[in-house]
């Protein structure tokens, strides 16, 4: 049984608005240490805003973001930088640098953020590329030479090379064909299992839920309105959950 001691991330009464548009409206959520948690919901409900608030990329209006028992939403300077080292994020678009080789993209944080020598950083980058199913030769290519799915793999390698405690994924299968999406979903699960870390994924894709999730939360009207295990989601009598699942099935 999970206890409070197992909680890695606590979100308490989060509020975020843009003008009169309310995005997060008293959101509460616990994410346990080393679990794979997936937030689902249709496009436009605020999933990406939630991620950015968790990282401090957007300020919250009020509420608390607690990681490892410490309040983080008001951290500044060195304390904030230390907190951010716990996280790595794979953005929806991959956000690779076109002017750099693939290995340079993967090693960017090591070289620029930690001062790791380029020779060692390249070796570590190639190791991480191999971990996500790519070979050393790919490391010498540029992002525009790779498919969308391969770019997603590179983004995964760039995230895990930083050895985060918490790995965040923003709509990991967006824009991908079903075969490639399945490969990326399997890769996310592999990263979670092999690295034994906490993963937090936001998606509108039920195939991601089925492959990746230990537990699932449904975001609607600015709150997590339902949460449970993968087995429980199919049995849920929550109207919004069933409506979302039905729409996904229909679209597939």
How would you name each of these model-derived features?
Residues 167-170:
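Catalytic Walker B motif of ABC-type/P-loop ATPase nucleotide-binding domains
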């Amino acid at each position: 049984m999970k206890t409070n001691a197992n909680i890695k991330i606590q979100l308490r009464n989060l509020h975020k608005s843009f003008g009169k548009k309310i995005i997060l409206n008293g959101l509460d959520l616990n994410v346990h240490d080393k679990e794979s948690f997936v937030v689902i919901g249709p496009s436009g409900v605020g999933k990406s805003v939630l991620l950015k608030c968790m990282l401090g990329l957007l300020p919250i209006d009020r509420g608390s973001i607690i990681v490892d028992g410490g309040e983080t939403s008001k951290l500044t300077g060195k304390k904030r930088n230390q907190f951010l080292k716990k996280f790595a994020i794979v953005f929806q678009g991959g956000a690779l640098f076109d002017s750099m080789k693939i290995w340079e993209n993967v090693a960017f944080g090591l070289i620029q953020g930690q001062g790791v020598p380029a020779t060692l950083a390249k070796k570590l980058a190639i190791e991480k590329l191999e971990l996500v199913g790519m070979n050393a030769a790919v490391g010498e290519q540029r992002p525009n030479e790779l498919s969308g799915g391969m770019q997603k793999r590179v983004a995964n390698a760039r995230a895990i090379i930083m050895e985060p405690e918490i790995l965040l994924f923003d709509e990991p299968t967006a824009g991908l064909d079903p075969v490639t999406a399945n490969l990326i979903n399997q890769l996310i699960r592999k990263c979670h299992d092999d690295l034994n870390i906490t993963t937090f994924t936001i998606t509108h894709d039920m195939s991601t839920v089925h492959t990746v999730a230990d537990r699932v939360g449904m975001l609607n009207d600015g709150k997590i309105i339902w949460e449970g295990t993968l087995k429980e989601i199919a049995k849920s009598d929550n109207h919004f959950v069933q409506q979302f699942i039905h729409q996904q099935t229909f679209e597939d």
